[in-house]
Amino acid sequence: MGPNFEILSVIKVLLAKIDVIFKKGLKMWSRDSWRKFNILQQPSYPDETELKKAEEKLKTLPPLVFAGEARNLKQDLAKVCEGEAFLLQGGDCAESFSNFNAVNIRDMFKVMLQMAIVLTFAGRCPVVKVGRVAGQFAKPRSSDYEEQGGVKLPSYRGDIINGFEFNAKARVPDPNRMIEAYYQSASTMNLLRAFSRGGLADLHEVNRWNLGFIKKPDLDAKYGELARRLSQTLAFMEACGMNASNTPAVSETKVYTSHEALLLPYEEALTREDSLTGDWYDCSAHMLWIGERTRGINDAHVHFLSGVHNPLGVKIGPNATAQDIIALANALNPQNEAGRLNVIIRMGADKIGERLPKILREIKREGLNIVYSIDPMHGNTIKAANGYKTREFDKILAEVQSFFDIHRAEGTYAGGVHLEMTGQDVTECTGGSFKLSQEDLAQRYETQCDPRLNADQALELAFLIAELIKKI
């Protein structure tokens, strides 16, 4: 081989060692180093011994996802970053132990596929499907306590932490709930993998569901043309010999998982070193995000996620500045990788027009690779006259419309949408073609946290977004 080859080999080994030192040493990151930082929105467990036992148990359990899958998602999101794909992220506000069953998971999977096929056809580009599922249990709260009828108890923080029932026993944080959340997430992952490859994702079947949707009163006139054009396209593909037996893309799909990485003891315990690359991945989900309340640049959540190699999201509210986002990008994506960072805008229909354009202009000058998506739910939450927390469909749509209009005006790419939704026929958000009123909310108000779009509202929103991304 010669001396030059040997020298090059030695240099490669040294460079690899330097890279490992940089990753593990100079960054001063380990999966438990977040414990030295200021942290918000964490429960106070009464029994530290029980907490330690639960953490150690989680560390022995298999990963819920694999590093290679997270890398695949990053590659898919890189296409979104380049304007060649679209991100559809959606699911429950907060998963619960009591409502866990195969039917609910199937129905959520179905409505995501229905939305995705509409968006794919309209946008002429792949849709990256990411569920708020298989781990979306913990919820940040605006107050540490909740009061009902003069009784004050700790706030409900999600089933992974404490119980929804309003009594003193249920509201005590229990670390063993992390174990139950893990096993439920594992079961959910198993179902999602089966649904993705077991025939439920067949494009013809998904389109038939959509045709059933537009048969409902007043919907055919609005959305029928797009649905029928899609039917014609699928029929043409079939005539050309492209079917489930010879074209896997017709009957199979990929659905990734995500959740807010809020409860850091759980996330730490499921963070593993990839045997192929030596990089650390949070194997509780393919993608994690940091909430608006916990995105402090010097706080524990940003520090923890800076060290894992999953794709990451950050929720951005109306008080954020471009400098805040630039600082977060430098901390979470120092290599400026396309597909690594998703900025999720959640400003509200009344504020996005004033705040977002300036932010986009400043960030554009920095040349940062960012996937921009819109969360039109959190900034549009109101309290109805009858006491129910709700969201108006028209306000949700208005923020989505503004998001696309602003990106178009600024020459940037509106890359996706992030929704709290369900496959069930709940009555939690008002409006839509079925004109749910505040009086209707009591019929099937089932959320344990924030109001969700029901299956019809979510699909209708997809048809309306299709008009915004439509390419002739």
Regions found by a protein language model. Give the residues of each.
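Short, positively charged and aromatic/hydrophobic N-terminal segments
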Residues: 7-12, 16-23
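N-terminal basic/disordered segments at the start of proteins
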Residues: 25-84
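Short, compositionally biased low-complexity segments
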Residues: 29-34, 43, 77-90, 142, ...
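A general structural signal for short secondary-structure junctions and capping/turn motifs
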Residues: 77-80, 118-120, 304-305, 406-410
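Short loop/turn segments at strand-loop or loop-helix junctions that form parts
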Residues: 88-93, 130-133, 374-377, 420-422
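Active-site-facing alpha/beta catalytic cores
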Residues: 94-95, 99-348, 391, 399, ...
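Non-transmembrane, aqueous-exposed alpha-helical and coiled segments at domain scale
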Residues: 340-372, 378-426
